[in-house]
UniProtKB/Swiss-Prot annotation:
Keyword annotations of the record: Cell cycle, Cell division, Cell membrane, Cell shape, Cell wall biogenesis/degradation, Magnesium, Membrane, Metal-binding, Peptidoglycan synthesis, Transferase, Transmembrane, Transmembrane helix
CDD domains: GT_MraY
Official protein name in the record: Phospho-N-acetylmuramoyl-pentapeptide-transferase
Signal peptide positions on this chain: none
Pathway, per record: Cell wall biogenesis; peptidoglycan biosynthesis
Gene that specifies this protein: mraY
GO cellular component: plasma membrane
Role of this protein: Catalyzes the initial step of the lipid cycle reactions in the biosynthesis of the cell wall peptidoglycan: transfers peptidoglycan precursor phospho-MurNAc-pentapeptide from UDP-MurNAc-pentapeptide onto the lipid carrier undecaprenyl phosphate, yielding undecaprenyl-pyrophosphoryl-MurNAc-pentapeptide, known as lipid I.
HAMAP family: MraY
GO MF annotation: an example: metal ion binding
Native source species: Micrococcus luteus (strain ATCC 4698 / DSM 20030 / JCM 1464 / CCM 169 / CCUG 5858 / IAM 1056 / NBRC 3333 / NCIMB 9278 / NCTC 2665 / VKM Ac-2230)
Entry's family note: Belongs to the glycosyltransferase 4 family. MraY subfamily.
Length: 375
């Protein structure tokens, strides 16, 4: 626990202290946000606000992770060094953040709403996602556990949904596809949620906070300890909890400057990097489907865009919402930006609570704690 506390505080301090320095750096170079003309009129005042703040969040994550492990080693705390799971998850996070950085930098330098072309962004994300998936199925520990498994998971692996049903080679190929689908879904979900001051930052912090609890619980109920009923076959759960704690702290530190009126935006650097991190946590903690519940707000926002675009094409130009994503619909209905953000945070908290309840309920059922219910 001391490791999680040190990591979380370090992430918070590095992010909170580093963000204003980064703001000055961006302002000095004129790196400001480009605002679309067809967006809500209240957003016109956001034009020129420094962006790419995700670089501070991700940078704080990496730096705090390395410093924490170093400090724990010096203090003689038996926490273990950086693990394969931790390093591979960081690779995915940093890789996706890099794609977002290129996209942000292109928008800023060319002063347009389109950065990378959709095809270019998809290709870069697929390359990083594929590298992540392949690495995640390697590096077995002393029990033979790799960071990821080929089984599709809900609150844990589902044995009868193993993608390696036709052999290891087919399993790897299908897992690469499945992993890329998850990564694409989470990165786009965070990206679409990042439209109002502090919305995506706060919502993501709630989800990563949930992954601190999930990973901690998996560590305490690991099959490596006693192999009791309902135990978890997860590699490096404590290191995953550390990363989740650091990222939560980094997000809260950034939120101090990102809350309304925002002094800086996370940009695609942040949204894609955070989406990559959420995908990594979901895959490594064997909660690939459950993450859709934890991130229920982001799922709803993403669906609002899909529904809007789909109905617009089918109906010949009609719209379901005043504007998509969903948060802008409520803005146009007259809700103040802060009102939308706080109410959406509450919805996100509800989703996270339901997700954690499902996760714990799954374990409880396997202990025989819910009579008449089978896992």
């Amino acid at each position: 626990m001391i490791g999680l506390l040190i990591g979380g505080v370090l992430g918070l301090v590095l992010s909170a202290a580093g963000t204003p320095l980064f703001i000055r750096f961006l302002v000095k170079r004129g790196y400001g946000q480009f605002v679309r003309d067809d967006g809500p009129t209240t957003h016109k005042t956001k034009r020129g606000t420094p962006t790419m703040g995700g670089a501070v969040i991700i940078g704080s994550l990496v730096l705090a992770y390395l410093i924490t492990h170093g400090l724990l080693a010096v203090l003689g705390v038996d926490f273990g060094g950086p693990t394969a799971s931790g390093l591979i998850l960081l690779l995915l996070t940093v890789g996706m953040a890099f794609v977002g950085f290129v996209d942000d930098f292109t928008k800023i330098t060319k002063q347009r709403s389109l950065g990378l072309t959709p095809r270019g962004k998809i290709i870069l994300q697929a390359l990083i996602g594929t590298a992540f998936a392949v690495l995640a199925l390697n590096f077995p520990d002393e029990r033979g556990l790799t960071p990821a498994s080929t089984a599709i998971s809900f609150a844990r692996d589902i044995p009868w949904l193993d993608l390696a049903f036709a052999g290891p080679a087919i399993g790897v190929i299908l897992f690469v596809i499945w992993s890329n689908l998850i990564t694409t879904a989470t990165t786009n979900a965070v990206n679409l949620t990042d439209g109002l001051d502090g919305l995506a930052t706060g919502a993501t912090a709630m989800i990563t906070g949930a992954y601190v609890l999930i990973s901690l619980f998996q560590s305490s109920q690991s099959c490596a300890l006693e192999g009791t009923r309902g135990c978890y076959e997860v590699r490096d759960p404590m290191d995953l909890a550390l990363l989740a704690a650091i990222l939560t702290g980094s997000l809260l530190g950034f939120l101090w400057w990102n809350t309304s009126p925002a002094k800086i935006f996370m940009g695609d650097t942040g949204s894609l990097g955070l989406g990559g991190a959420l995908a990594g946590f979901a895959i490594f903690t064997r909660t690939e489907i459950l993450v859709a519940v934890l991130a229920g707000l982001m799922v709803a926002i993403t669906l609002s865009v899909i529904i809007q675009v789909g109905w617009f094409k089918v109906s010949g130009g009609k719209r379901v919402f005043l504007m998509a994503p969903l948060q802008h619909h409520f803005e146009l209905k007259g809700w103040a930006e802060v009102t939308v953000v706080v109410r959406f945070w509450l919805l996100s908290l509800m989703c996270v609570t339901v997700g954690l309840a499902i996760f714990y309920g799954d374990w409880l059922i396997r202990q025989g704690g819910l009579a008449g219910v089978t896992p």
